[in-house]
Amino acid sequence: DWILDTFLGSGTSIIEAKRLGRNAIGIELQKNVIQIAKDNINKEFNKFNVKYEIIQSDCTELNYIKELKKFGISKVQFVIMHPPYWDIIKFSEDENDLSNCKSLKDFLNSIGKLIDATTPILEKGRYLAFVIGDKYSAGEWIPLGFYCMQEIQKRNYKLKSIIVKNFDETKGKMNQKELWRYRALVGGFYIFKHEYIFLFKKV
């Protein structure tokens, strides 16, 4: 089996692939993040001798068919996507970084473009996991997760499950739980403590 992670980040998906004996390809835009991922991945013993590769690229523009040919394969058996939650946290100055999308429409168009690029190389009947949270801005809840879900459902995917993952702290609120609670009470807004894992089957 081969898995594809289009937003590799710190390398967790490849670490888990090594533990499970699955070959893996990770895509990451930022060079400095790739080095962090490599350091993390190298700490994990490769007892199953899995193959894995990290590619520095804009995941929405990559020629996936060409990249897979390098490994002698034409399909992957699982795809995971954990994109930036639009502009909640700005990860870089790169204009290709999804956290720099100027509007919700631009962000969703980029997600749709990525789904279109990866759908042909996901084996039929296999699964796509999409991890995303919502956004709260100017007194309004923006259901980012469900907007992305709808973009994916426009393609050849059937929604199989929605897993809600609870968490108490995020990067943006690290060690500031009481401060953010106070801000929420005074400002009249909601503190997010969850994100979604949407599980889709390619049909």
Give the role of each language-model region.
Residues D1-V203:
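Class I S-adenosyl-L-methionine-dependent methyltransferase catalytic core
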